[in-house]
Each structure stands twice: as C-alpha cells, then as structure tokens.
Amino acid sequence: ADQWREEVWNFIKIRSDLNFIIITKRIHRFLECIPEDWNNGYNNVTIYCTCENQKMADYRLPIFIDLPIKYKAIIHEPMLEEINIEKYLQTGVIEQVICGGESGEDKKCILKPSFYFKIHFFIL
C-alpha cells in the first residue's frame, strides 16, 4: 500500500464530491500514513477503527480517540465477544458503530444478540 498511498490521497482530495471510508485495524500507524495537509482530516473521509474483542478495543480505541480525525467510527467485525465501549462512546467523538459476525464454514464465534444490544444501549 505504501507505494500508491500518495496517489490515493490525491484522488481523495480531488474527488471532494465523494465520501470515502477508510477501515483499519492498524490505527497505531495512522500518523505515519496521512498526507502533510491532513490537519484534523478531510471533510469527505471517515476513518473506521476495527475492534474484534475487548482486548483490541482497549488497545486501539484510546489511540483512535486521540488522533486528529474529523469523522470517527468503530467496526466490531467479526465481533468475537461482548465488547464494552461505553467509556469510548462517552468521549462524543465516535459517530457510528457497526457490529457484525464472523462468516464462513470455519467461523469460531457465533454473534449473540446480547453482544450488540449492549452497544445499542450505550449509544442511546
């Protein structure tokens, strides 16, 4: 990805009429990968941080919350266990949370409704 990253950022800037979603599980590398004129983000870019379990949420989300990103969202997919993100949502910087299960014949975890109901109530 490094060899074409600058080209992609230029395209995103040029196409301000489109909204771009960037999904990453490597949020700790974010500052290494943004363009010089990023400031606190582009108006047409939302960054999604993935967290599949509580351990990763507690590692990635504090980093994510502190980054200069205008539009922030979380993806729990595959959501492998119940995840408590209440303290991260209380910051007011997370605009959306998406939850999804694991797919395929070899899936290790079946998403239980209780996993996402708790997150739903935190958001309300």
What are these regions (language model features)?
Residues 1-123:
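Conserved AdoMet/S-adenosylmethionine-binding subsite of the radical SAM
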